[in-house]
Design a protein with these regions (language model features):
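Activation-segment/catalytic-loop signature of the eukaryotic protein kinase fold
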Residues: 64
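Activation segment signature within eukaryotic-like protein kinase domains
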Residues: 97-98
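Protein kinase catalytic-loop region centered on the HRD/HxD motif
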Residues: 103-113
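Regulatory extensions appended to serine/threonine kinase catalytic cores
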Residues: 251-297, 308
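Conserved short submotifs of the Hanks-type protein kinase catalytic core
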Residues: 68-81
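ATP-binding glycine-rich loop module of kinase domains
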Residues: 20-42
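Conserved catalytic-loop aspartate of Hanks-type protein kinases
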Residues: 162
Length: 382
């Protein structure tokens, strides 16, 4: 049965041009319902594979389908905040966050799945500061500001295109803004094709990033933000090594890192854990998802019918389980007596006028099943 058939609570989390997102409670568990705009399509094989991935950094898909020509997903609710709402983060925290994202992407890749639409809106940061990657398997280039150049040319997502998106995500987390902007599909495609010419370090310096941090980030830009897929790092394992090196240089040691991390998470605490709680945003489930549920009256009628049927069966059982002749015995006797009917018909005359008939004595000699209470029903022989 659909999870949505048991929804008892619903709240609107987000409504945008790409999708509507609801938080729903069904059978005591919290889920997210993401209902996409018309025209969005999923790769069915990818969605099936994702449902088999058990990694804390990857969302759990529970149900998928289509309503009113628009696809939808139901997945376990992730209590956190989209990275798109975080603003600029400390460099060490941003690198740590991206490193966790890369581990999640590697888990997907091990199952033959590539995200294809990695962007800050699809990375949910939980209350403990760890990320969960959502919205995998969409057909198309995805968010244009994060799509690799080859994706604009119609190529399917792969590890190389996801690596490019990781670079764009890292820049957004450090700078607080997107690296490339545009107002049309073509303008984004052109900007992506010219990404090699962007002086990322100068842009971040203008946003107040320290010189020592800029030098630690430089190898990451060179390994990720490249128009030609062959110029990017080989795979997620190589990227993880680069991130580990960069983190070690900017974190300032374990004590400094734990202090920075605790302060950053505390600063986010006012938002994390408040989304979808309480009555704010409460709404009805979209009518397209409404399912007929038994009302209290219908339940009572159904129960009464079932109970009546049970009582009838019990009565029949006791009626035919008494000591009188069984149905089979009665049938056999009737068959035997009927063999003499031809000889009797025509000889027996009714006292009132001669109509042929069957002797009443013969009929009285036929055995009948005994019924409970027979003889006590108030009927007597004349």
């Amino acid at each position: 049965m659909s999870i949505l058939a048991g929804v008892s609570q619903c709240a609107m989390l987000h409504r945008g041009g790409e999708a509507e997102i609801y938080k729903v409670v069904s059978q005591g568990r919290e889920y997210a319902l993401k209902w996409y705009a018309a025209g969005v399509r999923f790769d069915a094989a990818s969605i099936e594979a994702i449902s088999q991935v058990h990694d804390r950094g990857v969302y759990r898909v529970r149900e998928t389908g289509e309503k009113a020509g628009r696809p939808y997903l139901v997945y376990d609710f992730v209590d956190g905040i989209p990275a798109a709402e975080l603003g600029a983060l400390p460099v060490a925290f941003a690198i740590s966050l991206v490193r966790d994202v890369v581990r999640a992407l590697a888990a997907l890749a091990s199952c033959g799945v590539h995200h294809g639409d990695l962007n800050p809106s699809n990375v949910i940061v939980c209350a403990d500061g760890t990320p969960v990657v959502i919205d995998c398997g969409i057909v198309g280039p995805g968010a244009p500001a994060y799509a690799a150049p080859e994706r604009f040319q119609g190529r399917a997502p792969d590890e190389k295109s996801d690596l490019y998106s990781v670079g764009m995500l890292l820049y957004r987390l450090v700078a607080g803004v997107d690296l490339v902007v545009g107002d049309t599909f073509e303008s984004y495609a052109r900007a992506a094709s010219l990404v090699d010419e962007i002086d990322t370090t100068s842009l971040l310096y203008g946003r107040g990033v320290k010189a020592e941090e800029l030098s630690c980030l430089e190898p990451l830009w060179k390994g990720l933000l490249r128009a030609d897929p062959e110029d990017r790092v080989e795979d997620f394992d190589e990227l993880d090594e680069l991130l580990e090196i960069a983190f070690g240089k900017v974190s300032g040691g374990s004590v400094a890192w734990e202090t920075l991390r605790a302060g950053t998470v505390a600063a986010l605490a006012e938002k994390i854990g408040t989304i979808g709680h309480g009555s704010e945003g409460a709404c009805a489930l979209p009518v397209e998802f409404a399912m007929i549920k038994p009302t209290g009256g219908r339940k009572r009628v159904a129960f009464a019918c079932i109970l009546g049927l049970i009582l009838l069966l019990v009565a029949l059982f006791f009626a035919f389980s008494r000591g009188g002749p069984s149905i089979d015995e009665t049938g056999a006797s009737i068959l035997q007596k009927s063999r003499s009917l031809d000889a009797i018909v025509g000889e027996a005359q009714d006292s009132s006028g001669g109509d042929s008939g069957v002797s009443g004595t013969l009929l009285e000699s036929l055995p009948t099943p005994e019924l409970e209470g027979a003889g006590d029903n108030g009927v007597t022989d004349e």
